[in-house]
């Protein structure tokens, strides 16, 4: 299912262009749309990518006779949501189902695994000071392992999953603060996790956005106001959709995976366990 060496051919596709999408989908049996953004940039707006882009892929897939479509959305997708991100995700879902009623919609929570942009990002931040600042410290998340998510996508792409919307989350939920403490325990660092109040975060985000705009994109956009709105809402399943249990997939706990890829952020890296063992021998 993951593709043997030499059997995967990467091709360019601009999901804002009908001809590009049609060329990519021509002759396909299934399509999996994983395209999504967390921040808007130029013409790559939430609507352009997550709503209109999803509509274009589904419409052309139907026209090309593609049998199965899997569309990645996100837990919290809501046409009346507080963030542009969540509303664009919901709009994309609606368009996909309009053109491909038999599509499988996957709504994951925060995804973790090697090279993820969640635990890796904050583990890297923890290297540079005694304080780890976060926005939405008490917001609940239920992280899902990337391999479990991939297994769900395979079932959808091969027609082994029933059509519908699946909210996919791991076996454990925790607050943002709790997840950071788990991560710090894995990388063996002691840091003070400080929750930034929402009103302060909104001011910070507005400042970042202004700086980004005035420098024509040179200044980094560390936080946006839309992300602050997203971080004010729990990111856990509603219980109103299908789930991993309907796919027969047993979910993976964070503790069994995090240490496999976060060890480079330990003070002694790969030698941390050896040093700890040697210290115990001396005592």
Walk through the language-model features, giving the residues of each.
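A hydrophobic C-terminal alpha-helical subdomain
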Residues: 199-283
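Conserved beta-loop-beta element that borders a ligand/cofactor-binding pocket
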Residues: 73, 93-120, 124
